A protein has these predicted regions:
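FAD-binding core/adjacent interface of flavoenzyme oxidoreductases
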Residues: 1-9, 24-25, 37, 80-122
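Glycine-rich Rossmann-fold phosphate-binding loop(s) that bind the pyrophosphate
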Residues: 10-14
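Short N-terminal binding/cap micro-motifs at the start of the first secondary-structure element
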Residues: 15-16, 38-41
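Gly/Ala-rich phosphate-binding loop of Rossmann-like dinucleotide-binding domains
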Residues: 19, 23
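Short beta-strand "acidic-cap" motif of Rossmann-like dinucleotide-binding folds
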Residues: 27-34, 42
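Generic beta-structure capping elements
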Residues: 34, 45-48, 116
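Conserved catalytic-core motifs of eukaryotic protein kinase domains, centered on the activation segment
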Residues: 42-43, 122
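N-terminal Rossmann-like dinucleotide/flavin-binding domain of flavoprotein oxidoreductases
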Residues: 43-105
């Protein structure tokens, strides 16, 4: 079982930004995503489409946004569990036990769901 300060479900922009912020305050985290690569919808569906709603960035593409977020994470040791889907989330006292379809188990006090509106499966 993997023990971590936080488990982020979703490796799209919100999940990546959340991982960055957690590491900045000294918390360890792991990220699980059903897709086989980092970036979520931005990289999977519209890597070349302009995005206009990121604060302080007037315009960027999905690929640029993803690459910038990945570059910001490089100084940190973040483990990504790609091509893995969360199958079970269960409360155990003050912790959560999270299990994936590949049999990976996590124990954490914090589960952050960053699946976004573009999640491909319920």
């Amino acid at each position: 079982m993997i023990k971590t300060d936080a488990l982020i479900i979703g490796a799209g922009p919100t999940g990546l930004f959340t991982a960055h912020q957690l590491k900045l305050i000294g918390l360890n985290c792991e990220v699980v995503d059903n897709l086989d690569k980092i970036g979520g919808q931005c990289i999977e569906l519209y890597p070349d489409k302009p995005i206009y709603d990121i604060p302080a960035i007037p315009e960027c593409t999905g690929e640029e946004l993803t690459n910038n977020l990945i570059n910001q994470l490089k100084p940190f040791d973040i483990k990504f569990h790609l091509s893995e889907r969360v199958d079970e989330v269960k409360k155990d006292g003050d912790k959560w036990i999270v299990k994936t379809n590949k049999g990976t188990s996590f124990i954490t006090p914090n589960v952050i769901i960053a699946g976004g509106v573009g999640s491909f499966e319920p």
